[in-house]
């Protein structure tokens, strides 16, 4: 859970990113024409090579890989029980070899999970703004630097840049993720900036690509800014305004121990908050 002021939601983002990305143009229908009768047809046409798309990750296999990974600290592994990373990524449809992105990656906990899930043939972008990296005497900067030291996560590409100046290629990402960040964007900067945040990420997704938004559930009428939560309905409205198709999952990370009245840092619920996942699809 990260709470911070994010500089990228200043005037530049409000002006440049708040406008939802335009829907992809519809494909042009081309009518096939029959070959003229006098054209000879080859007696034996070459067989088309069948390309089988990789299946989504195997939850048990990825869970085992995360538990066994010598690169992961004991502290990182201890969070798996509450965050259920393999189940979440399987729900989002990530596959070995995918191009993935972790937006507001902070110290890179989700970045490393994505790295293991996509495997050596995949790529993971880890994006942070300078404001995020500068927090707490550059704690996130130091943590991410240590995590990537010695090329230990060789498939990760670090992107220290604002969302208003992304160098991640447009329409290149299969699955993106932002974990426990969206409430900060919405609560600190309002719905327009929240739509801009999602729209900027949408621009990096392939047609049919998916963005997963994980956050602490709040309830209408509560002081969710103080509690570091968000009403899922507000997140859904922002995602729809940004042009996404929205699917909500309230089961994978649900927690009956959380009554939504406590600050997420309260020891009674810390690490056990009731969380929702938005599976946001960029229309094809």
What annotation goes with each model-predicted range?
Residues 14-16:
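C-terminal motif of bacterial Sec signal peptides marking the signal peptidase cleavage site
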Residues 18-21:
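Bacterial signal peptide processing site
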Residues 61-91, 95:
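Class I SAM-dependent methyltransferase Rossmann-like catalytic core
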Residues 95-106:
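Conserved class I S-adenosyl-L-methionine
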Residues 98, 166-177:
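A short acidic, Gly/Pro-enriched loop at the edge of an enzyme's catalytic core
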Residues 115-116, 192-207:
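A short glycine-rich, Lys/Arg-flanked "PGG" loop and its adjoining helix->strand segment in the class I
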Residues 124-125, 208-217:
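Conserved beta-strand signature within the Rossmann-like core of class I S-adenosyl-L-methionine
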Residues 242, 257-284:
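Core SAM-dependent methyltransferase catalytic element
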């Amino acid at each position: 859970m990260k709470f911070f002021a994010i500089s990228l939601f200043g005037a530049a983002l409000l002006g440049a990113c708040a406008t939802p990305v335009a829907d992809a143009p519809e494909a042009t229908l081309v009518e096939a024409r029959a070959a003229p009768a006098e054209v000879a047809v080859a007696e034996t046409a070459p067989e088309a090579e069948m390309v089988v798309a990789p299946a989504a990750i195997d939850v048990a296999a990825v869970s085992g890989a995360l538990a066994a990974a010598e690169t992961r600290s004991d502290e990182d592994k201890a969070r798996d029980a509450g965050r259920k990373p393999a189940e979440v990524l399987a729900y989002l449809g990530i596959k070995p070899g995918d191009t993935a992105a972790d937006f507001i990656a902070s110290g890179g906990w989700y970045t490393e999970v994505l790295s293991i899930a996509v495997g050596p043939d995949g790529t993971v972008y880890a994006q942070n703004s300078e404001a995020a990296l500068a927090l707490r005497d550059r704690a996130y900067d130091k943590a991410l630097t240590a995590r990537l030291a010695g090329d230990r996560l060789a498939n990760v590409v670090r992107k220290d840049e604002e969302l208003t100046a992304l160098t991640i290629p447009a329409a290149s990402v299969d699955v993106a993720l932002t974990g426990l960040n969206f409430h900060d964007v919405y609560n600190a900067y309002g719905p327009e900036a929240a739509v801009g945040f999602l729209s900027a990420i949408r621009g990096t997704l392939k047609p049919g690509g998916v963005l997963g938004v994980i956050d602490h559930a709040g309830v209408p009428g509560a002081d969710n800014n103080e509690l570091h939560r968000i009403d899922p309905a507000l997140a859904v409205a922002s995602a729809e305004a940004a042009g996404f198709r929205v699917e909500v999952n309230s089961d994978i990370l649900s927690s009956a121990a959380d009554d939504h009245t406590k600050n997420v840092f309260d020891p009674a619920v810390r690490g056990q908050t009731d969380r929702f996942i938005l599976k946001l699809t960029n229309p094809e």
